[in-house]
Amino acid sequence: MSEATPFGIYLHIPYCKAKCRYCDFYSAPGARGVPQSYVDALLRELAKNTRRPDTLYFGGGTPALLVPAQAAALIEAANPLPGAEITLEANPDVVTLETLRGFRAAGVTRISFGVQSADDAQLRRLGRTHTAAGAAQALAWAREAGFPEICGDIMLALPEYTNAEFDRTLALLRDGGCTHISAYLLKVEPGTAFYRNPPAGLPDGDAAADFYLYAVQQLEAAGYRQYEISNFARPGHEGRHNLLYWNCSDYWGVGPAAHSCVGNVRRFWPDDVQGFIAGTVAEQREGDCTSEDYLLMQLRLVSGLNIPAYERRGGRFTTAQRVFMRQCVGHGYAVWDGEVFRLTPAGMVVQNAILEELM
């Protein structure tokens, strides 16, 4: 592959202070930092790569448990291209102004905070370990540290949720200088504390859809342009790394539970942090990237599915599916100009049902 072809690297940092009650990601809770042995294992794998990335993403877990010197070593080993986007996820309560300055000096260009809510009781219910005031402080420190991109997450349709809670959370992120906001619905996944003991007051599907549509409206009004189902940005501040996923470009994941798609081949690492450190586990082939993957990812984007590009990947819509697509337009779920089929916010609410008909 040419370096002109977009390429990103994802580094999984599974360590976190505590497991949130809704989290189904592979993680190692109870950590106060990231063991150097784990960083060394990442460096070992990065040394095998010869392709310089356009984006580098530290995900977790809580990557901000790294010390800046560890992050700097990993960034240097990844050898990103000039102007690369380098993202680090953080919880508000694990950073200080000093550590944020250290991450910025190490080369991180984009800091992403899991704020979720401006309601302290809600944060406790979720199992989060920060407060709304702590989130506001972390955002202020990020501005002072000089990050050009500051991102915040909002969870929607939480227990006992109201639009007023969303408004307060949006105000916290907007006033905190966020250039990018992710807003996504709570999903109660198997294996989570919420699945074992569901919280009272969860909104039903119709109410959750209303919360989502309200969030889209308010984010747009606040100057955050929607570009993907759950992602909104000031113009020019869209997340470049996740766009690699949604455009089915090449990305390489490193670390336990990390996934890759390079050269149309999907691979993954087993959920085994000790095996990864010891070098006794290896990436496994998961399958090929298909035209259905492309359809699934492209319909997440506001820009929609380019049908000629889909057909070049081997995809085809039947006559019945094209009739269904026209029905989606008639119901206000989609816009279709013949070449590009894209979902409206109302269509994004029922995206899964639409995909069932098109795949």
Residue ranges and their predicted role:
Residues 4-8, 27-316:
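C-terminal scaffold of the Radical SAM
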Residues 11:
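Conserved N-terminal Rossmann-fold NAD(P)-binding element of oxidoreductases
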Residues 14-27:
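Local cysteine-cluster metal-coordination motifs and their immediate loop/turn environment
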Residues 300-304, 333, 359:
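Hydrophobic alpha-helix feature that most strongly marks membrane-spanning transmembrane helices
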Residues 315-329:
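Short amphipathic alpha-helical interaction segments
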Residues 329-339:
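A short, conserved structural fragment
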Residues 340-344:
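Minor-groove-contacting beta-hairpin "wing" of winged helix-turn-helix DNA-binding domains
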Residues 346-359:
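Short, amphipathic alpha-helical interaction segments positioned at domain boundaries
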